[in-house]
Amino acid sequence: MSRQLSRTDNLIHQFDTILRTLVPHAATASRANPAAGTQDKAMSDAERRHAAGLMRINHTGEVCAQALYQGQGLTAKLHETRDQMEQAAAEEIDHLAWCDERLRELDSRTSYLNPAFYAASFGMGALAGKLGDNISLGFVAATEEQVGRHLDDHMHKLPMGDRRSRAVLEQMRTDEAHHERWALEAGGARFPAPLKLGMRLMSKVMTKSVYTL
């Protein structure tokens, strides 16, 4: 059972999470990098730039996921599922660190737009939390489903020689599927198709802009 945190403890924790999420190279993974021991094959400069664009999108997706969990943490009750929510958020920090590390290996960087997407996702998470735990958990499930779609698409689009990025994305895909399943089993509402379509359209704005910026 988690220790009950004071208001000051919560503020410190929130600020620390913001820093680890938005400051480049600040996130530290609690698990080993899935790409450890995996070697890339030869890639052209164009392939490396393409791989970096995809990994930048994935990194920003994890920034959004972390903001979602943090926003919900401020407003949702989640008495029965807070431990699982905190575990999922910790795994998203792992994903942030792995994507950041891979971007550096590809001689690239994280997106300049991360603060804006963080703020938007934080607000949506806080609003979802206010609407009740079933909506909050349903939003987690729908978001993780969307992230999973991106990961599947990116694993298909990665250059054949980029084995290290693929290893990272495969582990992330496993984690995201687990988060989605947990949120639904915990009572999350299944969002209707029109709402999911709206989320996909918003996601396209992110992917188009972050690929280069």
Swiss-Prot record:
Pathway membership: Cofactor biosynthesis; ubiquinone biosynthesis
GO molecular function, one term: metal ion binding
Binding site for Fe cation 2: E92, E144, E176, H179
Localization: Cell membrane
Biological-process GO terms, alphabetical: ubiquinone biosynthetic process
Cofactor: Fe cation
Cofactor note: Binds 2 iron ions per subunit.
Enzyme class: oxidoreductase
Protein keywords: Cell membrane, Iron, Membrane, Metal-binding, Monooxygenase, Oxidoreductase, Ubiquinone biosynthesis
GO CC entries: plasma membrane
CDD domains: DMQH
SUPFAM superfamilies: Ferritin-like (SSF47240)
Gene3D superfamilies linked: 1.20.1260.10
Reactions performed catalytically: a 5-methoxy-2-methyl-3-(all-trans-polyprenyl)benzene-1,4-diol + AH2 + O2 = a 3-demethylubiquinol + A + H2O
One Pfam family linked to the record: COQ7
EC numbers: 1.14.99.60
Positions of Fe cation 1 binding: E62, E92, H95, E176
This protein's name: 3-demethoxyubiquinol 3-hydroxylase
Organism lineage: Bacteria, Pseudomonadati, Pseudomonadota, Gammaproteobacteria, Oceanospirillales
